[in-house]
């Protein structure tokens, strides 16, 4: 496999082509952003940690029957992945009220929900990734109802698998967001699963072990990511 030119650079990753048109190299950066890019910073070795965490969690999910774009971890910052067309939606899964949902609905952070909540947002930086519903997504040509049904099914399987896994590591999976990619073989879980994309709280202390520490200037951000890596790697 030969790495070629950069195809795309996002907030947290760079995507490079390879000599195989069906694969890409994903490079994990140390850049940190919050509030749709309004807050910017750097977390030392974040890319290294998130690459490792994502690689291990994607391998776990593959074993549990969730198809992903992940092929292999190449080095400490890069992984080889299947090339996909990203559906321009984020699927957000919430087990406990926190973040924007708690604020939007006037709920206390940490409130248990009577059922898991599934939301979608339109991936559009200019619009600040607005929350939309299924009908919006289909009406403006982003997806189909059939595809959405499959996306929610993937999200539910990811949630069930990771909730159980993290619980065994003494971590509460509060909420997370995923991205889905279209490939010739159907839909694949893409992007990453890490403290950048999940809210993860220590089961005993309630300590936040995710990007909220950066968002809210709580300090010890690197240490929190390292703690998640340590527990995932048990």
From Swiss-Prot:
Query: What domain of life?
Result: Bacteria
EC number(s)? 6.3.2.6
Query: What pathway does this protein act in?
Result: Purine metabolism; IMP biosynthesis via de novo pathway; 5-amino-1-(5-phospho-D-ribosyl)imidazole-4-carboxamide from 5-amino-1-(5-phospho-D-ribosyl)imidazole-4-carboxylate: step 1/2
GTP-binding found in the keyword field: no
> Per UniProt, which keywords does this protein have?
ATP-binding, Ligase, Nucleotide-binding, Purine biosynthesis
One function term, GO molecular function aspect:
phosphoribosylaminoimidazolesuccinocarboxamide synthase activity
Q: Which EC class does it fall in? A: ligase
- In Swiss-Prot or TrEMBL terms, this protein is called Phosphoribosylaminoimidazole-succinocarboxamide synthase
Q: Which organism is it from?
A: Clostridium botulinum (strain Loch Maree / Type A3)
Q: Please, one GO biological process term?
A: 'de novo' IMP biosynthetic process
- Reaction equations catalysed: 5-amino-1-(5-phospho-D-ribosyl)imidazole-4-carboxylate + L-aspartate + ATP = (2S)-2-[5-amino-1-(5-phospho-beta-D-ribosyl)imidazole-4-carboxamido]succinate + ADP + phosphate + 2 H(+)
Protein family according to the UniProt entry:
Belongs to the SAICAR synthetase family.
CDD domains with a match to the protein in the record = SAICAR_synt_PurC
């Amino acid at each position: 496999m030969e790495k070629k030119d950069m195809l795309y650079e996002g907030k947290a990753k760079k995507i490079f082509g390879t000599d195989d048109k069906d694969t890409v190299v994903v490079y994990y950066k140390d850049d940190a952003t919050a509030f749709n890019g309004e807050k910017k910073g750097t977390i030392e070795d974040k890319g290294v940690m998130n690459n490792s965490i994502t690689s291990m969690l994607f391998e776990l999910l593959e074993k549990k029957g969730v198809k992903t774009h992940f092929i292999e971890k190449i080095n400490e910052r890069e992984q080889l992945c299947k090339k996909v067309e990203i559906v321009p939606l984020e699927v957000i899964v919430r087990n406990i009220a926190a973040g924007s949902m708690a604020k939007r609905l006037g709920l206390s952070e940490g409130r248990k929900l009577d059922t898991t909540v599934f939301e979608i947002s339109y991936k559009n930086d200019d619009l600040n990734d607005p929350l939309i519903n299924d009908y919006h997504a289909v009406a403006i040509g982003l997806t189909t109802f059939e595809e959405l049904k499959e996306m929610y099914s993937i999200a539910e399987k990811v949630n069930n698998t990771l909730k159980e896994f993290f619980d065994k590591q003494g971590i509460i999976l509060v909420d997370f967001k995923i991205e889905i990619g279209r490939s010739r073989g159907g839909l694949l879980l893409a992007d990453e699963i890490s403290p950048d994309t999940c809210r993860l709280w220590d089961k005993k202390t309630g300590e936040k072990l995710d990007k909220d520490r950066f968002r809210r200037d709580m300090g010890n951000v690197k240490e929190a990511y390292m703690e998640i890596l340590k527990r995932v790697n048990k």
